[in-house]
């Protein structure tokens, strides 16, 4: 799952897995790191909703993992909602949900526009751009900094730490980068509170310690930057390559909302995640799952499971792209709004935008967890800058 071959065509790999193994597949997440990949939809729902038998706490597992394992920064235990179980999970989850629920979605709509327009103006007169490095990433980064109340100087260090985590840099180095930057943010927000997630986490009755606060913010950025950037880019790829979205098929062209819903079903940006660790050997679908070995939900493969996939995506929210059960994403409304608005801003400004190469020439970044393009070159008629109000 970490190979370039898998990244190039994971759906072929999932089909072969299903043919050979059924709903549960033995895989390696990294060389010498075994796991079970869940590719059956109903099996995934069952496991995700059974935290007593399948907790998300990896501490026993990681004792057997070398410190230099490249996926350790992604999976190691942290005192946050994503990597905890039981009462710990409930405490962290309540604090995170309250902090996220405090986001003003109407104001967020305006915030996306305020970021998108200046970004578009940096390349609209060139007639060409890379939508990953020049639009999707900087927009996602700026919006998340705004939501977190994070100034640009601290945010730059956070972005570096996040990139290091997804690229498999040494766990101690990743944690040092994050720890320093996010401690600075927490110190700032204690002195200058605002209408932001960091301030709300600080004020929550859970009374989170500094290390806990840092790790809630690690989750915010980890679940935000890379997956949200990829959601935008992959949806744009669908809209730029499928004739339906270009209005070349009779009838009304599907909307950005339709494209997002379809993409979340067919090719979700966080393709394999929702990791749990069985407390004891557990028999599922005739397969014994070893105790404390990672069980990874393939949201991508499960969504495309022939048992449930009928090709109807309109107002269909049964996909697993946001996860399900007690660890389901609490910020899906925020992510959906940001992606929808960012895509609309770009296509409204540059309606004749198209890929600068054929889709099969695009390079997908290797990695067991994400579905991510390395670059997304586009061309368009040169356009004057947009007016910023």
Segments from the language model and where they lie:
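Cytochrome P450 catalytic-core helices
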Residues: 214-221, 225-250, 330-350
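Cytochrome P450 core scaffold surrounding the K-helix E-X-X-R motif
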Residues: 303-311
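Conserved cytochrome P450 K-helix E-x-x-R motif and the immediately C-terminal K′/meander segment
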Residues: 250-287
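Cytochrome P450 heme-thiolate "Cys pocket" and heme-binding signature region
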Residues: 310-376, 384-389
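Active-site substrate-recognition loop segments, prototypically the cytochrome P450 B′-helix/B-C loop
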Residues: 1-132, 141-159, 163-165, 172
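Cytochrome P450 catalytic core segment centered on helix I
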Residues: 148, 157-207, 211
């Amino acid at each position: 799952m970490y190979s370039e071959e898998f990244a190039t065509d994971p759906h072929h790999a999932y089909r072969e897995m299903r043919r050979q193994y059924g709903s549960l597949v033995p895989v390696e997440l990294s060389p010498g790191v075994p796991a079970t990949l869940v590719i059956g939809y109903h099996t995934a729902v069952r496991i995700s909703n059974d935290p007593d038998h399948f907790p998300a706490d990896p501490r026993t597992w990681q004792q057997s993992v070398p410190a230099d394992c490249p996926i350790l920064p992604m999976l190691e235990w942290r005192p946050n909602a994503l990597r905890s179980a039981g009462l710990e999970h409930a405490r962290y989850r309540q604090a995170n949900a309250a902090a996220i629920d405090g986001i003003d979605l109407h104001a967020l709509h305006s915030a996306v526009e305020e970021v998108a327009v200046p970004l578009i103006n940096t390349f609209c007169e060139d007639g060409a751009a890379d939508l990953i490095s020049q639009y999707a990433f900087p927009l996602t980064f700026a919006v998340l900094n705004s939501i977190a109340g994070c100034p640009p100087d601290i945010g730059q260090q956070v972005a570096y730490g996040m990139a290091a985590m997804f690229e498999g840099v040494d766990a101690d180095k990743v944690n040092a980068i994050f720890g320093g930057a996010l401690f600075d943010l927490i110190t700032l927000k204690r002195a200058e509170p605002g209408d932001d997630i960091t301030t709300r986490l600080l004020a929550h009755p859970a009374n989170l310690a500094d290390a806990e606060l840092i790790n809630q913010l690690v989750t915010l950025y980890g679940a935000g930057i890379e997956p949200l950037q990829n959601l935008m880019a992959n949806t744009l790829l669908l809209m730029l390559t499928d004739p339906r979205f270009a209005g070349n098929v009779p009838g009304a062209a599907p909307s950005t909302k339709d494209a997002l819903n379809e993409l979340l079903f067919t090719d979700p940006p966080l393709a394999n995640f929702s990791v749990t660790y069985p407390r004891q050997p557990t028999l599922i679908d005739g397969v014994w799952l070893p105790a404390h070995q990672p069980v990874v939900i393939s949201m991508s493969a499960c969504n495309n499971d022939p048992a449930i996939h009928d090709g109807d995506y309109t107002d269909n929210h049964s996909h697993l792209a946001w996860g399900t059960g007690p660890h389901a994403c609490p910020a899906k409304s925020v992510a959906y709004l940001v992606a929808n608005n960012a895509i609309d801003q770009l296509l409204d400004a540059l309606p004749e935008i198209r890929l600068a190469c054929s889709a099969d020439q695009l390079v997908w970044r290797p990695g067991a967890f994400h579905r991510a393009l390395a670059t997304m070159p586009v061309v368009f008629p040169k356009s004057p800058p947009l007016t910023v109000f």
